[in-house]
């Protein structure tokens, strides 16, 4: 600017001052960093986890003995209830029996058949790799980042899954990993998640990627274990952060004791998701609660669930209840109907089918 002024000394003073002010104004505008934009909220469905494909300890195991897939019966039941988001847990060992090998054709067909059936019914699917940051190799469990199981190995399977499902209109998101925890210091969850995001985006630039929190994805302890996830980079800017929460004393979801012995209150659920929701707002990020559930043996749990879901709904955070599926039997958290009769928790779930953007605080 000074060089320009010196070379134009013949310009009258009034014009010089005018130009200087205009230039300074322009300079300020071009050097001010753009404001960080928050997420654009739209109405999102709540739903359920439909379990079965992640069942069993034998890997890969036998279909319909060690594990199964949810059926059309489950899809129709929850679709008719208006719960149109399904989190589908699956095991890495089954969809890709050999590291960096091809996807198993039969297992892939089961997954695709389920996704296709959901698509024809207007039901959205989250593909949830239910592996906790680990995988069994020859019957022995290894953690990602160990000599036996590299970050590149898990990136490979997600690249192949993305190629297979990127054209589906009802994939709500790729759930990178269920509940990573106690990861290696040399290979933290942040580094793994970033590698998976980068790899997926080489083949699919559109589908949402769900990044679970570290430390079992705890919403309650999110700032402690998962604060650094705000620094993940997605060239498509389409990440959703996934937390889990349960209302028993240790937030494990075991519910070993009574409502009173678990020190639960009507506001336990709200109190435990507040740290996660506040983190989302502070960092202008989008979130999702992939697991929450209550027993059917005390109606007070239902009020705790109701209050939490209302809080989530009014803060534009949707979620999926844990759980449903054909093999749950007498599991007290299950919302699979018994003999055609709705479970008690269903009454609460039906009050909270979608988020309400106009109410978002």
Label the predicted regions.
Residues 56-63, 92-109, 133-149, 254-259, ...:
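Surface-exposed, active-site-proximal loop segments in enzymatic domains
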Residues 4-13:
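Sec-dependent N-terminal signal peptides
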Residues 15-18:
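C-terminal motif of bacterial Sec signal peptides marking the signal peptidase cleavage site
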Residues 63, 67-68, 156-159, 163-173, ...:
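Extracellular glycoside hydrolase catalytic/binding regions
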Residues 24-85, 348:
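N-terminal carbohydrate-binding accessory modules
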Residues 67-84, 100-131, 135-173, 189-201:
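An active-site-proximal structural segment forming one wall of the substrate-binding cleft
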Residues 51-56, 85, 91-96, 131-135, ...:
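Solvent-exposed loop/turn segments at secondary-structure junctions
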Residues 20-22:
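Bacterial signal peptide processing site
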């Amino acid at each position: 600017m000074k060089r320009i002024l010196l070379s134009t000394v013949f310009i009258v003073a009034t014009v010089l001052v005018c130009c200087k002010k205009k230039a300074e104004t322009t300079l300020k505008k071009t050097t001010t960093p753009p404001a960080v934009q928050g997420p654009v909220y739209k109405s999102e469905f709540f739903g359920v986890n439909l379990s079965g494909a992640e069942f069993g300890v034998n890997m890969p195991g036998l279909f319909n003995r060690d594990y199964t897939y949810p059926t059309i019966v489950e899809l129709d039941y929850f679709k008719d209830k208006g719960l149109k988001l399904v989190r589908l847990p699956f095991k890495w060992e089954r969809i890709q029996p050999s590291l960096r090998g091809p996807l198993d054709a039969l297992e892939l067909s089961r997954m695709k058949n389920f996704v296709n059936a959901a698509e024809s019914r207007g039901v959205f699917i989250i593909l949830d790799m239910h592996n906790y940051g680990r995988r069994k190799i020859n019957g022995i469990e290894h953690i990602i980042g160990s000599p036996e199981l590299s970050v590149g190995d898990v990136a490979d399977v997600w690249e192949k899954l993305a190629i297979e499902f990127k054209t589906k209109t009802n994939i709500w998101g790729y759930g990178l990993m269920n509940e990573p925890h106690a990861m290696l210091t040399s290979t933290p969850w942040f580094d793994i998640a970033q590698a998976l995001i980068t790899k997926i985006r080489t083949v699919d630039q559109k589908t949402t990627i769900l990044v679970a929190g570290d430390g079992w994805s705890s919403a309650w302890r999110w700032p402690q274990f998962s604060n650094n996830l705000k620094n993940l980079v997605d060239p498509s800017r389409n990440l959703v952060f996934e937390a889990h929460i349960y209302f028993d004393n240790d937030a494990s979801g075991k519910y070993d004791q009574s409502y009173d012995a678990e020190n639960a209150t009507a506001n336990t659920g709200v109190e435990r998701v507040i740290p996660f929701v506040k983190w989302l707002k502070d960092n202008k990020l989008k979130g999702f609660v992939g697991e929450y559930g209550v027993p059917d043996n005390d109606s007070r749990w239902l009020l705790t669930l109701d209050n939490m879901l209302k809080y989530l709904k009014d803060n534009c955070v949707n979620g999926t209840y844990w759980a449903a599926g054909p093999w749950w039997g007498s599991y007290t958290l299950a919302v699979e109907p018994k003999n055609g009769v709705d479970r008690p928790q269903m009454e609460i779930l039906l009050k909270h089918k979608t988020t309400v953007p106009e109410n978002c605080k």
